């Protein structure tokens, strides 16, 4: 490894640098690396002990300059001085310039006598800033003087002082190198000249060193070897220069023809032999020869290129630095190891030893190589080329080197281009002079490789004269018999160049061996001996390549050597990926039999087959698709840009007009015709085109020729010309589309899949074009997979239209934009980025087909074109108006829009609205209004109303409508048994996942999903598991053994039998599966059975997919089966030649299955289509099929906002239910498997398919009559048929249940199910594992204590019946849902007469087009919610109370309680209010959880408060009215007694004691109802400055409410959040003002007191009806025991007791105080509103419902509430005033109740404030204020009396009070942040809200009445 640090020297080119290096290093390197023959030469480059340079240490006194920079500068200065002194002639300069220019990687172009030139090469532009800076400095310092100045002259010129030091002998002995000298002298110069610039210091030091070396008296001593070498070098250079100037070059010596160069190479293992080396002139003895070292250069430390080096290198550098000279060093590596970083020790030590021996002669050398890698432009450890100045990292070479190569090495550039740099130097005069001086020539030691390029071994090698390659003569091909005479060029140098750039290698083959080489007879041979046998050549590989920019017509064969030389990377990659020993078979032509026949008939095809097709080139790639453009060259020849069929646009190529290509003339004619049509160009350049038969394109009329509103009765002539015929319904579609165009109505064509929407659209656009309505351009946006189909349809139906497909990568699209968008060259800016098209530019095409993605990606170009019409295929991509596609398309300039979709109502109305909004935003812009309009009406009305609105915009036909004669389709669900192997794996999967299954409440949805997927795999085939696949028996070719494969799966057993019969019947089959691995297994199965097949899955795209379809659909095709993956086999695939579809495993999403079987049931189908859906009996598959079917129903039948769009995901409960399905039976079987005589028992339920059953299954006539009548968009539901003969046992009892379609059963899940089923198996399995694994890991037992006490229930009763929905023996079970009446809602099972015995209705069902939840229809669900909002939580006896409103009276108690339980579970279910459904799939219907829970809480507080005082206050507010009412009733004996029932409470409830409220259904405990009586008492104690809070007798009269009262109360938002009521100061007024005050309430602004909960107001007539039917009942729920007792009490003064302990947080008590004072004084107890009225208001709310003010006022029991308003009855807005006052008053009471509850809880939790707390300090201040005010009350009176001193004191007191109050006010503002709040429930229970709700939503430990009811 050799070379210098830092950037190369400025005099690095040519001999100038060598001279400089000679002086610097005291050695003389040759001017050219090859001149080692010269005996006079001091050192041969190849034998130089390339010692590493010594690094210069940083000077402590000059820290500013980095070492590397300093070294570079020193070196550059010395270079200039020494170079200038050498007196080179102009020849050297010229030569140097030439070399510098020839090398594009030199570091500098500096030459003496000239200013430095900056190279223009691209690589130099990357020069770092530091380099540029240095070069600028160098330029500044560069002076043009030819003579180097002495140090004294330099210092004098600069005006600086010279040093006076006289060098002693000791100095000359010790300062043996420049480094030591510099360290000694530099401080002396710096001391004299402290401000000397670094560059000047370098120059002075250089001059001083030169003078010092010249004057050194010890030149011969070893101590001064370096100085001696330097002097010798100077002498030699001078002699060289003199010779150059004086002597002319010697004339060439005439030599006889010489042999070609040879050398003794060194193989990898060869020993090193000694060889003479003319190192020092006087030393003639030969020195041992060594392998020529490889130079490796370490990049400059100062540059950005980092040097990476190992520790070994660093050590070597350090050790070699001691002997290195000045600023250059060499690192050598000649070892066989190829690593430049870690060299072999042996070699290193050898080099060091040699260096030490020859230290007198050499101290290193400097090369003129670049110091950075040619490839990456970075520095570091680089490998130097021996034949040019380039350098490389080993990793940057291709292929990268692992180790440094041995000997001389040439870089890839030299190997490719030949040696130029070295050849130039060969002729340098310097070398010739040295050769002359040397005299004797020695054996040449050159740069040629030390080993054979072919076999990599040493020995005698033949060397090439123009490159470093060496060969054995026997390794050449053909071998040479002897060394040739004269100049010899190796195969690499004689290798012909390639004709272009290779794009890809297609195939390779063995070529013909070259002709053998004759061996000359030896001169001394016997003439009779036969001639020697000629040397045979070897066959070499030939590669068939495609050329860049050329078509496949130009593909040709090239030799391996050509590829290796010119395409190294591509060749290496090809070698890596392909077998290079055995050429690939050229069997690409497809069916051999067909191609053989065709070859016999068509000689042209035979030729093409021989030349191209057999090597993998498809015929389509050589067929012209269209000509895109033309160009004319200087000679007038025309070239055409051709786009080839089935190849992207970036493979388009230019071809000259006279190339022979099939149909070329036809396409040229077509190109010019189109050009003429679009631009009116007549003339065309080039040769005259041959006459070809081509239909002349007719120019479309300028004005419309046909009225588009007139219907076509038959298809027009221009369609007849295409050869196609439209179906009648397609003609109708065409007429409708044309009419809509004329009317300017944008439309949606929503025909069902398979009715030819693409054809209708193509014909519609063609008709616009042909009739002159529009010439386009038309934009079609479609899914990428269907674009090929669109191309075909346009080709077929619109032959005159120019259709461009704008798809592909950036390059393809750039070519399309340049050539296909316009005829004008500059219409669009070129390049890969899309840009706008010029406005005035004409458009070249009529139709542009593109994908959704490109609409947004290339919106710049597409958005700049004015489109006549937009067509969006599969338009449900526009269903979201927030999508980018929607927004971008909205910005396009579109005159007309047509959307195509097969499922316009796929999910919900919102999506339909977005489609309409896109079409006509001016009409459909209000989404909310649209949804509201269609939100709550039955389906039939909804569809009809929608139809009226959509009529002008949408056309939708179903196959059932338009093809009365189209073959029907029948879908049968075929239930299949698990094979024994599948059962084993099924049980194993369940057992292995026991812990995941058993984590009650905590089971992860993802883990359950994984279990389901594993079980689905098991149902398909056990070989889908790696373990089973490994153990499975295989055939020698690696395929599974067929019989074992079939036996392992129940489905394959059945499939085998079915396919056999289907094949015999001449049917063809599509088999769909979700899993591609299953398709692999099916391939093996079909191979085993010997059926031919095609396959499409997600990995097969575009053209390959279409080819497979075409092969299958081709007439007479042999393929019997087509394997498709369910999702990949979706859009745009037409397989109408098949008539049987087998869905091997159902997709999660039923839409995908429907799309799948629509592939066969479509236009073109002329046979009945049978669809067989395989479902494994009693497994997850069966359950998934049921759930998917029900979800599908829910999605389609309930066309309402929100529902259905997210039904794809399964809830945890659903997953758990799916997993449980059939497991009990599976494990039951296991128990009976022990006995051998269980066959008969098993047979009863196991499915058997014998020949008879298979025949019945495949019978195609079984359902024909029914299927033809299928109607409507729910056709897929009706097609779910059940093969009734499949199961031997049939449940006859379920036949009657046909009125209700069950969508989902109520979950009644046994939490211990998995525990009971799997615990034993799991523990057994763990024991087995432990036994097998030794001690193993401890298994933690999974015990769940949460739900342990829950009763066991058989979940199968309600949920997953062992027999699926499909085992019903009626095929009509799923049909005609819409025709059912709503009356027989619940199933009536035989023998079940009693309501109690009736089973609960299913959780979700559909009746008459409406969804029912547990038997509750939409109206009943709404009524239930209204009742909740009106009365709060239903009490235990709600079923017998006023709670049961009219709509709910038809429900049994069991159903009612079940629904209450479900409703409360939903309320407590965690999840967003925005979700469309609850976790169990029940529609949410806009339920707001917060509002409902708040209302329930408030009503509960009111009920509890009324119950507390009810037994004291009685049930009549004015007892005297009770008798009047009774008398009225007596006079109307026929009328029913009014019911006044309320929730039951024990009659002996004590005062101030909350009556117990029964626990809420479903285990939900509302906290308000479970508090203790101490709480209320505690809370009451906290009330301050209010009237007495014990029972108040009715004799007290309340004070009137004043006009200016203002109450601001926030509604209760939650338990913790209670706002303090703001109270405005009140003033007392006389009692007469009360009615006025009440009347003027409406004038008071009350912005805060707004009820956030919705108030549900029901029909008043309904209410009256209810009231007539009510029974007499107390508020506590009891009927009055003794009415006489009541009568006796009426004359006695009635006791009254009521209080709300709000702690003074509201103004309620101050109001009460004032009101009661007024009432007492005026004796108007009834007329002035006070505490008594408030109680009866709350009692009325409990009885009549929340905010039912009118009902309460009309009830005689609450007549007291009307008394205060009697004076206002004459006012017009009397009712409004009264209701407003009641609402405000109730708000205040509601707030007080909430605060009381909070205080009660605080007391219950023993919450108290710290005495030092700010609130307590506030309390103290308040006491001070109170004390101050009370103690100085007398001052007020005295001051009023005129006492002046008292007046002064009063002022002081008032000031004190004011200060105290302002302090308190400041404290109050800070108070809310500091008051301790009741911690939220979540904190107290240390559970998250989600966990609490989950626990509430689960069933309670003890059985609730609902559960009991369900079990009954």
Curated annotation (Swiss-Prot):
The modification Phosphoserine is found at residues 44, 303, 308-310, 319, 428, 515, 531, 1209, 1308, 1349, 1370, 1531, 1535, 1537, 1570, 1576, 1602. A motif (DEAH box) lies at residues 873-876. Its main location: nucleus. Its EC number is 3.6.4.-. GO terms for biological process: chromatin remodeling; double-strand break repair via homologous recombination; negative regulation of DNA-templated transcription; negative regulation of gene expression; negative regulation of transcription by RNA polymerase II; positive regulation of DNA-templated transcription; regulation of cell fate specification; regulation of stem cell differentiation. Signal peptide: none annotated. PROSITE patterns: CHROMO_1 (PS00598), CHROMO_2 (PS50013), DEAH_ATP_HELICASE (PS00690), HELICASE_ATP_BIND_1 (PS51192), HELICASE_CTER (PS51194), ZF_PHD_1 (PS01359), ZF_PHD_2 (PS50016). It comes from the Eukaryota. Changing residue 1127 to Q: In SIHIWES; no effect on interaction with HDAC1; no effect on nuclear localization. Residues 113-131, 340-353 have a biased composition (Basic residues). ATP-dependent chromatin-remodeling factor that binds and distorts nucleosomal DNA. Acts as a component of the histone deacetylase NuRD complex which participates in the remodeling of chromatin. Localizes to acetylated damaged chromatin in a ZMYND8-dependent manner, to promote transcriptional repression and double-strand break repair by homologous recombination. Involved in neurogenesis. This is Chromodomain-helicase-DNA-binding protein 4. It comes from Homo sapiens.
